[in-house]
Swiss-Prot record:
Biased composition regions of type Acidic residues, renumbered to the chain: 308-332
Gene3D superfamilies listed in its UniProt record: 3.30.70.1730, 3.90.105.20, 6.10.140.760
GO function terms (MF aspect): large ribosomal subunit rRNA binding; structural constituent of ribosome
Any one of the GO CC terms: cytosolic large ribosomal subunit
Gene: rpl10
Family, similarity comment: Belongs to the universal ribosomal protein uL10 family.
Family matches, as NCBIfam families: PRK04019.1-2, PRK04019.1-5
Upper taxonomic lineage: Archaea, Methanobacteriati, Methanobacteriota, Thermococci, Thermococcales
GO biological process: cytoplasmic translation; ribosomal large subunit assembly
Organism: Pyrococcus abyssi (strain GE5 / Orsay)
Function: Forms part of the ribosomal stalk, playing a central role in the interaction of the ribosome with GTP-bound translation factors.
Domain of life (superkingdom): Archaea
Full protein name: Large ribosomal subunit protein uL10
Pfam families, per database record: Ribosomal_L10, RL10P_insert
Keywords, ordered alphabetically: Ribonucleoprotein, Ribosomal protein, RNA-binding, rRNA-binding
Length: 341
């Protein structure tokens, strides 16, 4: 039987205890992180109540399985299936979605490397550069970058997109970008998987559009609210709207039936008044008293007013069109005069 080094046993024990001490356990890839950015990330994670521990993949796997057995949570073992590249264990009290967002927000720019895939479009901005004239001008021009020498410096004539998101950096372009000080890459902790409450979350699940989900929740809330009000399902949120709707419906029925209360009397009288005017319009003038005639006249003026405003507006537009046509004719005549002297 092969001898297992004591430091390995101790490492597995410490990792397992770490896993058992936090509700959220993440596997992260640290292989792309240089030493200094990695130390900064460790500090940020500690400041936010978590810990990052980097170890060998085999020891991390053993620690996860050991913790799963001791906690009686066999589903935790599934996390070990996502160990890849240079894995590290990140334990925290943040929920998986907040953790993913936190790690994405704390990614840092990095210099160009040949063969690396850029995460977003790379643009060389217009303007002077710190570069002195030399072979690099020809290299830029050969790659479609509009560069020329102005006042002893290499100047870019216009903003130029040299790479689209997902494209690979060539050695020639890497040299140019590094010379210009443009850092098209990002370094950070890449999430491999996160465990919480028996569920393992992968990056494609965690990478959500927050605003889209907020909009969806708001729409769902409004639909549920409207449904609850329409079926008169009382809750603390809907009871006021349900009572208001019931009151308005009862009032409408009472007005329709002519049932007089202090809430309906004004609407009933108004309805009767409008019915009276409609009836009066059908009668000869000699049968109407002066007060009724005044009311009918006032109603007619109110009805005609919007029509007059519309007609005035139409006349103004027609007048404006005529003036524009006359101006066009004058310009045409002036042009002919200039042409033929």
């Amino acid at each position: 039987m092969a001898h297992v080094a004591e430091w390995k046993k101790k490492e597995v024990e410490e990792l397992a205890n770490l896993i058992k001490s936090y509700p959220v356990i993440a596997l992260v890839d640290v292989s792309s992180m240089p030493a200094y950015p990695l130390s900064q990330m460790r500090r940020l994670i500690r400041e936010n109540g978590g810990l990052l521990r980097v170890s060998r993949n085999t020891l991390i796997e053993l620690a996860i399985k050991k913790a799963a057995q001791e906690l009686g949570k066999p589903e935790l073992e599934k996390l070990a299936e996502y160990i890849d590249r240079g894995a590290g264990i990140l334990v925290t009290n943040m929920n998986p979605f907040k953790l993913y967002k936190f790690l994405q927000q704390n990614r840092q720019p990095a210099p160009a490397k040949p063969g690396a895939v850029v995460p977003k479009d790379v643009v060389i901005p217009a303007g002077p550069t710190p570069l002195a004239p030399g072979p690099i001008v020809g290299q830029m021009q050969a790659m479609g970058i509009p560069a020329r020498i102005e006042r002893g410096k290499v100047t870019i004539q216009k903003d130029t997109t040299v790479l689209k998101a997902g494209e690979v950096i060539t050695p020639e372009l890497a040299n140019i970008l590094n010379a210009l000080g443009i850092q098209p890459l990002e370094v950070g902790l890449d999430v491999l998987a996160v465990y919480e409450d028996g569920i393992v979350y992968t990056p494609d699940v965690l990478a959500i559009d927050e605003q889209e989900y907020i909009d969806m929740v708001q729409k769902a809330y409004m639909h549920a609210f409207n449904l609850a009000v329409n079926i008169a399902y009382p809750t603390p949120e809907t009871i006021e709207a349900i009572i208001q709707k019931a009151f308005l419906n009862a009032k409408a029925v009472a007005v329709e039936a002519g049932y007089i209360t202090k809430e309906t009397i004004q609407d009933i009288l108004g309805r009767a008044f409008r019915a009276m005017l409609l009836l009066a319009q059908q009668l000869p003038d000699e049968l109407l008293d002066e007060k009724t005639k005044e009311l009918l006249s006032a109603q007619a003026q109110v009805a005609v007013a919007p029509q007059e405003v519309e007609e005035e507006k139409k006349e103004e537009e027609e007048k404006k069109e005529e003036e524009e046509e006359e101006a066009s004719e004058e310009e045409a005549l002036a042009g002919l005069s200039a042409l033929f002297g």
